[in-house]
């Protein structure tokens, strides 16, 4: 019994240490900015600005093992026209990364690089891509993400949208925030669905609108 208690205590300490270390490591990277407009458990409605990505085609099921991750890593490591080294950021986006077998993997350019102009890629397989901002419904979850897991989370998120009277685009993206060596339980993954803009119809006589009102308050995002 004593030995079992010691083993359990050691496992608990290791888990707490790993969790704390992972949060510290994640906080070391600049992250894509957003504002939280509404929160319901692990689901949020966020407002994102336009973002500049260094991007390349990727097979979703490969989780970057098809060489797509390394293409982008080489770009930020100096394989560009200016031989400029660019800081790694979070998250790594996979646009249309749930349904489509072929997606676009993208590294977010740091704000200073985006503002001054990102260097042109040397590799023909890497492009600079403007990711359009706007409102997104987002669900957060842990584990080692794969196509099946992402599809399951997308279904949960779309059910929430239907329940709350919101309409999402057909596309669903994924986002990952952690290095490959991070244990599954401590990983931060997300599925993001762009929201359709609601059309507001104004009654010429009364001035009333048929758009639903929202009492959600904007707040700064938390990691």
Where are these regions (language model features)?
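A solvent-exposed interaction/effector surface
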Residues: 2-223
């Amino acid at each position: 019994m004593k030995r079992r208690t010691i083993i359990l205590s050691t496992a608990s300490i290791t888990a707490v240490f790993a969790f704390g270390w992972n949060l510290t490591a994640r906080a070391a990277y600049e992250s894509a900015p957003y504002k939280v407009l509404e929160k319901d458990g692990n689901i949020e409605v966020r407002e994102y600005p336009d973002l500049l990505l260094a991007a390349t085609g990727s097979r979703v099921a490969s989780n970057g093992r098809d060489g797509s991750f390394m293409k982008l890593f080489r770009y930020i490591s100096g394989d560009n026209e200016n031989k400029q080294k660019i800081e790694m950021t979070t998250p790594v986006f996979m646009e249309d990364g749930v349904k489509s077998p072929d997606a676009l993997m993208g590294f977010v350019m740091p704000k200073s690089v985006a503002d001054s102009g990102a260097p042109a890629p040397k590799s023909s397989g890497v492009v600079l891509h403007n990711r359009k901002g706007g409102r997104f419904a987002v669900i957060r979850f842990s584990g080692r993400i794969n196509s099946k897991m992402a599809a399951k989370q997308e279904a949960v998120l779309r059910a929430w949208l239907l329940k709350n009277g919101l309409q999402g685009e057909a596309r669903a993206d994924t986002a990952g925030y952690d290095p490959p060596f991070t244990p599954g339980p401590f990983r931060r993954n997300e599925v993001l669905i762009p929201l359709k803009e609601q059309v507001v119809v104004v009654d010429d006589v009364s001035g009333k609108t048929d758009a639903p009102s929202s009492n959600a308050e904007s707040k700064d995002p938390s990691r």
